[in-house]
Amino acid sequence: MPILTTSSLDGSVLEIVLDRPKANTIDATTSRELSQIFDSFNRDTTHRVAIFTAAGEKFFSAGWDLNASNEGEAFDSDYGVGGFGGFPELPNRNKPIIAAVNGMAVGGGFEIAMAADFIVAADHAQFFLPETRVGVLPDAGTIRLPRLLPRQLANEIIFGGRRLSAAEAESWGIVNRVVPIAELMTS
């Protein structure tokens, strides 16, 4: 079973699905593959928008694969041209990317969602950065979140690990739209 699948929807929409049971985590190999997919998308003339989502309904992504770290993979390894998750650092990005958040967006998964141009979330989705609970700062979370939220709320999420429901994330402008899971890919 492939970890990443792509398909063309309506001819101009590229759907990218992450499928790494149990929590759709991302290791360096997966990140490099995502970078290649998003770099190709950026250059192709067929697709005008990409939708990035994940398999299942529990996790959009739990971010970095901690098991890969336990097996010796360096946390700061080569993620590919687009950075961790394939597109947050992609140079000359010229087409919109939609994160279709189908479950929990945790740590790096939340950071990847924030790097998208639009976020559509299932009504049961949650967003949080638990890294500081184990003494690690959430890399991009410390940069992106304070740009989206009042500083005090951003600090509470970054340093306190506060969880946001999809509805609360929408009320603060992090999420563009909250929909039932059945409507996530069609809204």
Regions found by a protein language model. Give the residues of each.
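Conserved CoA-thioester-binding segment of acyl-CoA-metabolizing enzymes
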Residues: 1-57
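Hydrophobic/aromatic residues within transmembrane alpha-helices
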Residues: 16, 52, 65, 112-114, ...
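Short strand->helix junction
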Residues: 23-24, 59, 135, 177
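Short active-site-adjacent helix-start/loop capping segments
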Residues: 25, 59-62, 68-69, 107
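Generic recognition of short, well-ordered alpha-helical segments
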Residues: 28-29, 64, 111, 140
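An acidic, glycine-rich surface segment that forms the CoA-thioester-binding/catalytic face
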Residues: 32-39, 43, 66-102, 137, ...
